[in-house]
A protein has these predicted regions:
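Conserved beta-strand-loop surface patch within small alpha/beta domains used
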Residues: 1-79, 88-141
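Conserved, mostly hydrophobic/aromatic
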Residues: 82
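Residue-level "edge-of-site" marker
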Residues: 85
């Protein structure tokens, strides 16, 4: 299970609406054991994918990942996952998402339809990398 505050949920939804018709993306910082984790902070990332591909792909550069690792250390948190939006597509992982994901992390996907944030889901990639499993996403007040 992944737990988000209402504030963090709102930040993700606003990022998805602002980036539309392109994908937004970012990194989730949090605490917890391997099963249940709580997101305490996030780091919005500028989608580094070439502009013609941003409507259906996102890219977080190695430099951004290093900066996020350093930020996590300063905050005494872990990188627990990532978020991105799917403009005008379901809030479910694509084959591209599976090919570029790593087990152990949470992957929040936000459906943005015609610029309006809709369904938000959480996924984890199986160790075999054959498929994602849906995870419970809890929003705290």
């Amino acid at each position: 299970m992944l737990v988000l505050s209402k504030t963090i949920e709102t930040e993700i939804r606003e990022a998805g609406a602002k980036a539309y018709p392109n994908e937004c993306c970012g990194i989730l910082f949090g605490t917890g054991d391997g099963e249940d984790q709580v997101v305490r902070s996030l780091r919005p990332i500028v989608n580094a994918r070439e502009s013609g591909e941003q409507y259906h792909r996102f890219l977080i550069t190695a430099e951004e990942m290093m900066a996020a690792e350093l930020e996590a250390r300063k905050l005494a948190l872990d990188i627990v996952g990532f978020y991105h939006s799917h403009p005008d597509h379901p809030a479910a992982p694509s084959e591209y998402d599976r090919d570029h994901a790593l087990p152990f992390y949470h992957y929040i996907i936000l459906r943005v339809a015609q610029g309006e944030p809709e369904e938000m889901t959480d996924w984890r990639l199986r160790l075999s990398r054959e498929a994602f499993d849906a995870e419970e996403l809890e929003i705290e007040p």
